Design a protein with these regions (language model features):
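Hydrophobic alpha-helical transmembrane segments of integral membrane proteins
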Residues: 3-4, 29
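Bacterial N-terminal signal peptides
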Residues: 4-15
Length: 289
């Protein structure tokens, strides 16, 4: 069962109105800013409500709601068949549209990458920007840790598989095109935080990374300088994300076990309201209406 959503983190909401019950919300990095900004929309009804936000991945969010340790979650994808089978009473509510941005340093003249070119960068088949119409410089990709929803999403769109290599600070990702026998020799360094990946690219003229479009837009609005590339010749505009002409487009969802009730229901309703959808836009996502 689906309805409209936004980005993901851990939100602990304590409402004295509900007899002190602690309401735990697990949400992604993309959705957390929306939840924070939507709080004033329900404060008059729940003046004693307080929020504590901690980050989590989509998988962790789903597991928390399914397992009863969180009353509200947020995901950047639909539920998988095994997740539905394990918890058939989970309900997704779509609240926003978002995308995945392909990002390079502002000094890089490259403006577009095709599906094959992104695959070639991640697998190490192409290692120099001059092979892609850019300057003579070794491409320095920055990947994301496995728990980040953008990894699975991007893999599915461009048709690659990954394998974790190394541990701790030495951890990275090996990539291969689906159907290929062997993984590429390039170990793509990874980070768990979107803004860390972005910071690396901002500092490195040869950098390349991918992250939620909403995060990239917010960073630009705050003054960060970098370039968001077109993908297969299509710009990541609101219209192109909504129409899915920009292939790296996705929906954001809130997740509950059964129909939302009480404070959670009002929070979901507030985010879906015209005022809430304005908040969605202010936080870099694309409103549903």
């Amino acid at each position: 069962m689906h309805r409209p959503l936004l980005p993901c983190y851990l939100v602990l909401l304590t409402s004295l109105v509900s007899a002190g019950e602690a309401i735990v919300i697990r949400a992604s990095m993309a959705v957390t800013p929306i939840i924070e900004s939507a709080k004033p929309l329900i404060v008059s009804k729940y003046p004693d409500a307080s929020f504590k936000i901690t980050p989590c991945g989509t998988k962790a969010s789903i597991e928390a709601v399914a397992g009863g340790t969180a009353q509200l979650g947020a995901t950047a994808r639909k539920l998988k068949d095994d997740e539905k089978a394990a918890a058939p009473d989970l309900i997704l509510t779509e609240i926003a549209k978002d995308g995945v941005a392909l990002v390079v340093n502002s000094a890089n003249p490259v403006t577009n990458l095709s599906t094959k070119q992104v695959v070639d960068i991640l697998t190490g088949a192409v290692t120099n920007w001059k092979e892609l119409g850019g300057p003579n410089g070794t491409i320095a990709p920055v990947g994301r840790t496995e728990s980040n929803a953008v990894v699975e999403f991007l893999n599915g769109v461009i048709g690659v598989e990954h394998q974790v290599a190394g541990e701790g600070k030495d951890q990275g990702m090996l990539y291969k095109a689906k159907g290929a026998v062997a993984f590429g020799s390039l170990k793509v360094p990874v980070t768990g935080k979107n803004l860390d990946a972005l910071a690396m690219v901002i500092k490195d003229p040869n950098g390349f990374t991918f992250l939620p479009l909403s995060v990239a837009r917010e960073a630009k609005a705050k003054g960060s300088t970098f370039s968001i590339l077109n993908f297969n010749g299509v710009e990541a505009t609101d219209a192109n994300v909504l129409s899915k002409n920009y292939l790296l487009s996705r929906s954001l969802y809130l997740l509950t076990k059964g129909e939302p009730q009480g404070v959670i229901k009002d929070l979901v309703t507030a985010i879906l309201s015209p005022e809430g959808q304005k908040v969605v836009a202010e936080r870099g996502c694309i409103p549903l209406r």
